[in-house]
């Protein structure tokens, strides 16, 4: 949905939500993800799994849509789907990652989520 929301604003379209968007998710800017992966390669322990996310990005899908719409100068519209369409929806309400192990390696996130979304949208506009 993240990519679809950005595609909507890049195409000068409103974001259409087909649920209340109350599910919480963790997100991560690609540069931060790459930085974390390198940090894990250099300082991580072999065989240990590390979560990568931006704790400042722990927002609901609705909040994500509103932030992206605001950056793109668009609106968020709600469309109630029929029962058949909702059968494919993810029922997980909260999917937030713990960064305890990654932070114990000394990795830190830089910048804020809104600025990173703004940067992503600007880069994509310029590449069109």
What are these model-predicted stretches?
Residues 1-4, 13, 18, 30-31, ...:
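Glycine/proline-rich active-site loop of Rossmann-fold NAD(P)-dependent oxidoreductases
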Residues 20-21, 98:
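C-terminal lobe/hinge of AMP-binding adenylation domains
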Residues 113-128:
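Amphipathic terminal alpha-helices
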Residues 30, 62-63, 85-109:
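Conserved C-terminal active-site "lid" loop/helix of NAD(P)H-dependent oxidoreductases
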Residues 43-87:
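Mid/C-terminal beta-alpha module of Rossmann-like enzyme folds, strongest
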Residues 33, 37, 52, 64, ...:
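Non-catalytic, hydrophobic alpha-helical segments
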